Amino acid sequence: MIRSKFFVSVTGARLFLAVFLLTLPLTAQTTPPSTAPPANTRPRARDLGLTFGLYDPGPKNAITDVPGVLVGQVTLSDGDNVRTGVTAILPHAGNLFQDKVAGAVFVYNAYGKLIGSTQVNELGQIETPIVLTNTLSVFDAASAIAHWTIAQPGNENVPRANPLVGETNDGWLNDIRGFHVKADNVTRAINEASSSSRGGDPVEEGSVGAGTGTIAFGWKGGIGTSSRHLPEKEGGFTVGVLVQTNFGGRLTIAGVPVWKELRPKEEASLRGDSGEDNPAANSADGSCMIVVATDAPLDARQLRRLAARAILGMARVGSTASNGSGDYAIAFSTTNRIAQTATRSQPIALLAEDALSPLFEAAIDATEEAIVNSLLKATTVQGFQSHRADAIPIPQLRRLLSNSLR
């Protein structure tokens, strides 16, 4: 079945947060495995009273709070073995090849694939939708983006395109060798992209799109998003982040060492399942793709600096950037456009270097919260060869956070 739809410091009084967490209704310990889960009612971080950093989120607390940014997702969940999908991010709704955006890529640990990244960093431009999927589908996705790009009105004579495609390996839950992501899945995700600024649905999180088959810290991972809006005195800009989480480490939420008390293997034993056959349960390996959007007027050099800060959000949740972890951050500005028809020069706005620090902080905080959201919203998934990844249990997590933040 294909389902398509289309985020550290803890603030506030600790005592208030502890009381708030304890008064929320408890939910089931784990979500039953499902190939097509119903509407996701699992909480986001702020539903648990958690906040991250100084700045407030935008209205949707999503990457689509950055004006013009679009997100589309296609989830592939078919039979017992297919658990994968596509997530597409569009910097704007126009012709991206003819009206490119300033962009950059920061590579923290390059054990992975990010097709198109070398040209992005060479030219400082992004000219296609950004697509996330699974490891073996990046090549088919890149081909689909190229075909989609040259087919757009106004691109009839375009002889090239630079698809930007990232991945994580979902082969534990998904029959990755089956190459189930097809060209029409990619174009469907792009075409069905919706933005909160256009009145569309919020970005769906958890076990959806490119996060359908991913695992993080031994729990079910997925897609997460968050945003920050700077006050007018600091520019009034918005920073939005979207993540695809499939990595490990020692899970830490809002500074609380969750990994010490709440572990996937222990939860599996409560079901009579040893959990020992899950290599992700105690592994720091895996990958994380981070996409950072902003309406601040930044050039490619500044955007690479912004992307680098997003990696610090991974560190806050306990990532150690292990040998086998492919950790990439893509950043773009919706303000600085580069016209394909430009001749010798074109003017751009550029933010002063001293004004970057609030944006850096916003990117770190939004990345941290997006990762936490990806875990909280993820539902339990059973897939390839009956492998199973449990959603992190909300009642136990709530009690742990409450006791630690009291």
Regions found by a protein language model. Give the residues of each.
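N-terminal secretory signal peptides that target proteins for export/translocation
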Residues: 1-11
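Sequence-pattern detector for short linear motifs
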Residues: 6-8, 17, 274
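Alpha/propeptide regions of enzymes that mature by internal proteolysis
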Residues: 29-406
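Short linear sequence motifs
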Residues: 9, 13, 45-48
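Bacterial N-terminal signal peptides
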Residues: 12-25
